[in-house]
């Protein structure tokens, strides 16, 4: 199968691969900040088989019913939840599913930071798999609301496309409160590690843009800057989920 279509829609990544035997379509949809739905469909109605390997030996792998867990030494981890009929097999190195529903299947990938959030992540994944179409619609409606507040009838279509892309970039760079980050915010980029924090010189601009379509996130973006305000009133350069990496200049 060769990839022939890749499209990043607002709120959804779409990939299609084709061969002489048919095509396979994948949709990756962020249900919320820590839950991702992967929908896979095939035109030739074959049974799907999935497998994966863990790349480092420091992580602990296990399975709970139809969920494969990978937990790092920090307690953070990833849960991959399959439909109950998938027949999940797992060991210390990875996982494999024996079979799933012919022609179509849905998988939920969840991220968690500790044992308490691990439990809620699995519960959320189970809920998503039970009502896939409902969660897809909720996500589509959320993005529709973002764009409705930005797209303007008095602007050329080319400008509206730039505005939509700006919204997609800001929301895609949304980082939730975690560790020493006490409020949500937007990071400048996922391209390099040092951009994975909240920077003073970017955060104000992020907040101004977000105020038009995600006002609560805009407020949190400002709040997080004041979480590390110095006694003399200064807002420091950048802050991270590990405060030892903060740059207080």
Task: Give short role names for the model-derived ranges.
Residues 12, 18-27, 237-249:
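Aromatic/His-enriched, Gly/Pro-containing loop or helix-boundary segments
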Residues 1-13, 31-35:
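Accessory carbohydrate-recognition regions in carbohydrate-active enzymes
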Residues 19-37, 41-196:
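Acidic/polar, glycine-enriched structural segments that form the non-catalytic walls/loops
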Residues 139, 196-249:
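Aromatic-rich carbohydrate-recognition surfaces in CAZymes
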């Amino acid at each position: 199968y060769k990839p022939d279509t890749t499209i990043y829609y607002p709120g959804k990544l779409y990939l299609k691969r084709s061969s002489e035997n048919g095509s396979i379509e994948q949709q990756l949809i962020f249900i919320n900040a820590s839950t991702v739905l992967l929908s896979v469909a095939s035109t030739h109605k074959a049974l799907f088989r999935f497998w994966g390997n863990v790349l480092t030996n420091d992580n602990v792998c296990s399975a709970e019913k139809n969920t494969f867990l990978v937990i790092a030494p920090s307690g953070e981890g990833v849960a991959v939840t399959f439909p109950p009929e998938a027949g999940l097999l797992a060991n210390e190195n990875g996982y494999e599913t024996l079979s799933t529903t012919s022609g179509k299947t849905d998988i939920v990938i969840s991220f968690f930071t500790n044992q308490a959030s691990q439990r809620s992540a699995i519960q959320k994944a189970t809920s998503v798999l039970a009502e896939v179409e409902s969660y897809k619609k909720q996500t589509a409606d959320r993005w529709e609301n973002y764009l409705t507040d930005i797209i303007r009838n008095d602007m050329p279509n080319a400008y509206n496309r730039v505005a939509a892309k700006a919204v997609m970039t800001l929301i895609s760079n949304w980082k939730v409160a975690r560790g020493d980050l006490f409020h949500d915010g937007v990071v400048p980029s996922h391209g390099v590690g040092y951009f994975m924090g909240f920077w003073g010189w970017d955060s104000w601009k992020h907040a101004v843009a977000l105020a038009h379509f995600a006002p609560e996130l805009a407020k949190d973006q400002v709040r997080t800057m004041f979480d590390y305000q110095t006694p003399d009133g200064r807002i420091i350069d950048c802050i991270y989920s590990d405060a030892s990496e903060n740059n207080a200049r």
